[in-house]
């Protein structure tokens, strides 16, 4: 029993926190790249940031395409933002951290139908207005009359009394 516990502890030490991250599909990886490109376009960003972990990744198929929602963390590097893709950019140990929410919708051919990327400084966290924007992105390109909710038309006509 003791050997089993020791080997389990050693295995957990080698896996670390990276082992708990979700495995990303090809669509999710592409969405992460789109989100990083979008993040590095913003003028207030001076230095490049690198992705240090994906906390959550969801993918939903709609009739107009695929909706991807990602929650991930970024940390500041020593490179200017124009060089963010270069492999020699190293993470600054005390660099700023950001927690990002990205919602991206792609059609079946891979064309971007809509996107939002919100990356506040880590201590803030995602807020409700971003959740509403995320829902709007998920519905991009969908037919608003293509589906109905149960009971949606149950009381659409007033009862007539005789």
UniProtKB/Swiss-Prot annotation:
UniProt xrefs under SUPFAM superfamilies: Cystatin/monellin (SSF54403)
Post-translational modification summary for this protein: Secreted in an inactive precursor form, prochemerin, which is proteolytically processed by a variety of extracellular proteases to generate forms with differing levels of bioactivity. For example, the removal of six amino acids results in chemerin-156, which exhibits the highest activity, while removal of seven amino acids results in chemerin-155 which has slightly less activity. Some proteases are able to cleave at more than one site and chemerin forms may be sequentially processed by different enzymes to modulate activity levels.
Cell compartments where the protein resides: Secreted
Keywords: Chemotaxis, Differentiation, Disulfide bond, Inflammatory response, Secreted, Signal
Main location: secreted
Molecular functions per Gene Ontology: signaling receptor binding
Propeptide: 157-162
Keyword field contains Signal: yes
Described purpose of this protein according to its UniProt entry: Adipocyte-secreted protein (adipokine) that regulates adipogenesis, metabolism and inflammation through activation of the chemokine-like receptor 1 (CMKLR1). Also acts as a ligand for CMKLR2. Can also bind to C-C chemokine receptor-like 2 (CCRL2), but with a lower affinity than it does to CMKLR1 or CMKLR2. Positively regulates adipocyte differentiation, modulates the expression of adipocyte genes involved in lipid and glucose metabolism and might play a role in angiogenesis, a process essential for the expansion of white adipose tissue.
UniProt-recorded name of the protein: Retinoic acid receptor responder protein 2
Gene responsible for this protein: Rarres2
